[in-house]
């Protein structure tokens, strides 16, 4: 194990390039779902909180929405600005879940994709109530990597349990239905979509190193971790590729 865990707003500063290249996108079906269930339109204003490098923001921008990407990590925020700067509907915001800096009752949707597990729930809920328009929607999204659907995914999970610095402590699977019910303040609906990525070894390594709990080059355990990753890839690859399978969970409430 290496140095103590960095603060959430600093965790991904040295992971940005891999995050941009190798993290999964989100299924287009999410837009269709929100159009049907929550009256999403091209006129909708979105606060994408914990927006990172802009992966989720891009989904809503392609639907014609206005998106305020709220991100406390400077390096992640700058990456999103580079990727999305040509879209006039994207607005980069230096803020956090507890202090978005957005005006009162100014957004139709608050979206948190792959980010809710970093939030301070009571303070975040108060801030979300402040910026959300009456009748607006909260949308929490996760790409949940399947842990044991295939022998490859089982082996990859074992690698994370062996080499991940604080993997078990920060994984979003730790968030249970009670925490979600408390955050939404009542009822919410959950929807699931299939998602997947295919990687050669370079992509698999980049996907691993995009995670804040994976030892970076020069840190203790890195070389042993990459050696094990090579072994796993060589064992399970088919035509030079392995497949990451995800369940994309979408929780919708108010």
Kindly give the residue locations of the regions a language model identified.
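Conserved class I S-adenosyl-L-methionine
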Residues: 1-41
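Conserved Class I S-adenosyl-L-methionine
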Residues: 53, 174-254
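Short helix-loop-beta connector
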Residues: 39-45, 103
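A short acidic, Gly/Pro-enriched loop at the edge of an enzyme's catalytic core
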Residues: 99-109
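A short beta-strand submotif of the Rossmann-like class I SAM-dependent methyltransferase core
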Residues: 112-113, 121
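Conserved catalytic/acceptor-binding region of the Class I
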Residues: 129-197
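A short, conserved alpha-helix within the catalytic core of class I
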Residues: 119-128
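Class I SAM-dependent methyltransferase SAM/SAH-binding core
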Residues: 45-47, 53-99
């Amino acid at each position: 194990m290496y140095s103590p865990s960095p603060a959430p707003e600093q965790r991904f500063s040295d992971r940005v390039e891999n995050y941009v290249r190798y993290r999964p996108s989100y299924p287009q079906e999410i837009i269709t779902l929100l159009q049907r269930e929550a009256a999403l339109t091209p006129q909708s204003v979105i606060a994408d909180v914990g927006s990172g490098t802009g992966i989720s923001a891009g989904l809503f921008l392609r639907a014609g929405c206005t998106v305020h990407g709220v991100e406390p990590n400077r390096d992640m925020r700058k990456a999103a600005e580079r990727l999305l700067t040509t879209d006039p509907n994207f607005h980069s915001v230096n803020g956090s879940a507890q202090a978005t800096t957005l005006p009162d009752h100014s957004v139709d949707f608050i979206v948190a994709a792959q980010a809710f597990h970093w939030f301070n729930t009571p303070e975040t809920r108060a801030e979300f109530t402040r910026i959300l328009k009456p009748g607006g929607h909260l949308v929490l999204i996760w790409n949940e990597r399947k842990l044991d659907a295939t022998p490859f995914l089982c082996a990859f999970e074992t690698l994370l349990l062996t080499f991940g610095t604080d993997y078990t402590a920060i994984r979003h699977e730790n968030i249970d239905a009670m925490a979600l019910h408390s955050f939404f303040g009542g009822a919410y609906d959950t929807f699931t979509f299939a998602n997947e990525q295919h990687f050669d070894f370079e992509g698999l390594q980049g996907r691993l190193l995009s995670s804040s709990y994976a030892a970076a080059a020069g840190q203790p355990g890195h070389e042993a971790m990459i050696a094990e990753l090579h072994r796993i890839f060589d064992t399970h690859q088919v035509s030079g590729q392995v497949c990451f399978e995800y369940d994309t969970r979408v929780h919708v409430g108010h």
